[in-house]
Each structure stands twice: as C-alpha cells, then as structure tokens.
C-alpha cells in the first residue's frame, strides 16, 4: 500500500478530519482530500464530547494563566529580565494557539468545518507558528541559561532584555518560513457535501508530503531538543564542578533556581509533545491508524500537546518565587478591590437609607 502520510499528518496538527477506516484507504483519492472522510463519524459521540470538553478546559485555564503571566511581566519592571522576556514570548504563542481550540473542538464535534476559508487559514497558520515559536523559544531559553551558568562574565553583555526581545522577533520571523506557506496552502474545501479545513500538498504528494513532514519533525522537535540537551549537559557538568557560581550566595541560588525552572518547562514540553510527534513520524513511514482505539489515541496525543500550553503558568507559580509573589499580589489586589467595591456600595446604600429616613422625619404628617 502506498504511503498516505500527508492527510493524517495535517489532521494531527490542526483538527480537520482524517480517514480511519482501512477499507477506504484502497480507494483512488488524491492525498490532500483524504482528510474529508470524517473521522468524527468514526469515533463515538461520547469520546468526541470528552475530547471537546478537554479542549475547552485547556482553553479557558490556559488563557487565564498565560494572560496573567504576560500581564505580570508587562506590569512589573523587575520582571523584565532576559529569561522572562522569553517566557512572555512562550505565553504569547500559547495564548494564540489556545484561541483556536474552540474552533477545532467544534470541527471535531460537528464533523465538518463551519467557519469559512479565512479562519481555516488562520487556524492552520497559528498552529504551525505555535509549534515553531515554542520550540525555538525554549531553545533560546536553554542557550540563555547556558551562557548565564557557564560564561557568567560574557553573560553581562549578552543577557539583556533588549537582546532577548530581538531574539523573540527573529524567532517569529523564522517561524514565518513555515507559517506563511501553510497558510497559503490551507483552505476550506467542499468534498462530499462537507466543508473540510485542510492543507493541500503540492504534487507529487507521494514525494512532498513525507519530505515536508520529516523536515518539520526535525526542525520543530528533534534538532531543538538536541540543542537543549547539549546545553543542559554542559550546565550540569558546570554546576557539579563548582560550589559557588558567583561571588554571592544569593545570586548563586537565584541562578540555580531559574535554571531549574527552565529545565522543568522544557521537560514538560518534551513530555507533552513527544507522543504526537512519534505518532506522526510513524505515520510518515506509512503506518496508518486503522482502528477506533488508534484514532482515539491519536486525538488524545494531540490534546496532550495543547495541554502543555496551560501547564506553563502553573509551573511558574510553583517554581519561581518572583512569579509566585506577583500572582499572589494580583489575586490579593483583585480581592481587595472587590471588597472595597462592596464596602462602597454598602456605605452608599446606608447613606441613601439614612437620607431617606431623615427626609421622612422632617416632612409634616397629614392631619
């Protein structure tokens, strides 16, 4: 059987519909249209509702958390460090992709794409931008940690917030190399009286599909993870080799704390994205999911990748004292503001009641 990789691969990344029934794989259908045999009908309604519910929960929780992270970094001057500038970029990418989940969830539940061509292109582009900006940002954070730990003198000139901002701009520009073309190739197409959101692979699909997919796998996952691994291997060797990295124990403790935070964020990212990346790679080699169980696993692996986008704010709150303090301050300020509003409202009502009573006492009673 010839490889049918392109269709399931695009399905994984932005939630269109792919072929899960092996009997249909033998039909003569162009590769870029195989997504149109909706797998949503192939999955039980209960499973679809579960996946959509997970998408919505991730969307709501992730948006609240990531927006709070961005607010804290913008609001407090002390939070505008090089590491936090990268964290802001990560939160921005996560926020954008989380905004697409209601549309993807609707697509899964209905079994077709109801939102038109422009939104289809937008969702596809955001998914790819998120994939590349996230891995590139984590790589930049790891290199930044490596410089801070292994080259502390050089770090004084290299690790500035302005240079971190420039790196973030370069990351988005580099991600556009993939984001713009897939947005152009993406479209909402009508097939069998259903509208499907998909990416049309250029002909010949047998060649360009696997080549493009393997390139994405390498540049969005394998190569960044290798760079990150090398950076942390060198950092661990450095941390074990010296007891004091800087002249101050407090500064040394802060360096180790931030390094641990970045390491945990990277580890969680790799843990969340490895299953779907491996699944996609297996499909690229020509092995297709042909059972309800395989389709369900693929869907949940995809959802796990999105779950990562709402986990980062939780990690910051637990592992970084500065974020924890800012989050606590924000929550306390919000609570105090609500209490003051309630108190002002009560005083206003009491004042009105008092004036009313006083007025009624001064008005002469009728004889």
Curated annotation (Swiss-Prot):
Lipid attachment in record (S-palmitoyl cysteine): 331
Cytoplasmic side: 72-84, 144-162, 234-261, 320-367
Gene Ontology BP terms: adenylate cyclase-inhibiting G protein-coupled receptor signaling pathway; calcium-mediated signaling; conditioned place preference; eating behavior; estrous cycle; negative regulation of adenylate cyclase-activating G protein-coupled receptor signaling pathway; negative regulation of blood pressure; negative regulation of cAMP/PKA signal transduction
GO molecular function: G protein-coupled receptor activity; neuropeptide binding; nociceptin receptor activity
Region forming the signal peptide: none
SUPFAM superfamilies registered for this protein in UniProt: Family A G protein-coupled receptor-like
Extracellular-side segments: 1-45, 107-121, 186-208, 283-297
Similarity section: Belongs to the G-protein coupled receptor 1 family.
Protein's recorded name: Nociceptin receptor
Gene: Oprl1
């Amino acid at each position: 059987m010839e490889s049918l990789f392109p269709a399931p691969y695009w399905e994984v990344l932005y939630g269109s519909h792919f072929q899960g029934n092996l009997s249909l794989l033998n039909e003569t259908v162009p590769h870029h249209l195989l997504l149109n045999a909706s797998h949503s009908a192939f999955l039980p309604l209960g499973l679809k509702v579960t996946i959509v519910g997970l998408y919505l929960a991730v969307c709501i929780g992730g948006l609240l958390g990531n927006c709070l992270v961005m607010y804290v970094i913008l609001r407090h001057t002390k939070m505008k460090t090089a590491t936090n500038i990268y964290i802001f970029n990560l939160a921005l990418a996560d926020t954008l992709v989380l905004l697409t989940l209601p549309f993807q969830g609707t697509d899964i539940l209905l079994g077709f794409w109801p939102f038109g061509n422009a939104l289809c292109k937008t969702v596809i582009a955001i998914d790819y931008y998120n994939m590349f900006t996230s891995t590139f940002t984590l790589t930049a954070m790891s290199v930044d940690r490596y410089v801070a730990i292994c080259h502390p003198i050089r770090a004084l000139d290299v690790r500035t917030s302005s240079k971190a901002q420039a790196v973030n701009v370069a990351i988005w520009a580099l991600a556009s190399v993939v984001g713009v073309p897939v947005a152009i190739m993406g479209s909402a197409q009508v097939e069998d009286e259903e509208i499907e959101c998909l990416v049309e692979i250029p002909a010949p699909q047998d060649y360009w599909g696997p080549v493009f997919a393997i390139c994405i796998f390498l540049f969005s996952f394998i190569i960044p993870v290798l760079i990150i691994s090398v950076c942390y291997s060198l950092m661990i060797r450095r941390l074990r080799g010296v007891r004091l990295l800087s002249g101050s124990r407090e500064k040394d403790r802060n360096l180790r704390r931030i390094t641990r935070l970045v390491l945990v964020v990277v580890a969680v990212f790799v843990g969340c994205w490895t299953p779907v990346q491996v699944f996609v790679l297996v499909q690229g080699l020509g092995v297709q999911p042909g059972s309800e169980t395989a389709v369900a696993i693929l869907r949940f692996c995809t959802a796990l990748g999105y779950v990562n986008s709402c986990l980062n704010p939780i990690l910051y709150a637990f592992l970084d004292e500065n974020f924890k303090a800012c989050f606590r301050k924000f929550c306390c300020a919000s609570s105090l503001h609500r209490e003051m509003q309630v108190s002002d409202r009560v005083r206003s009502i009491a004042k009105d009641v008092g004036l009313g009573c006083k007025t009624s006492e001064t008005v002469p009673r009728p004889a």
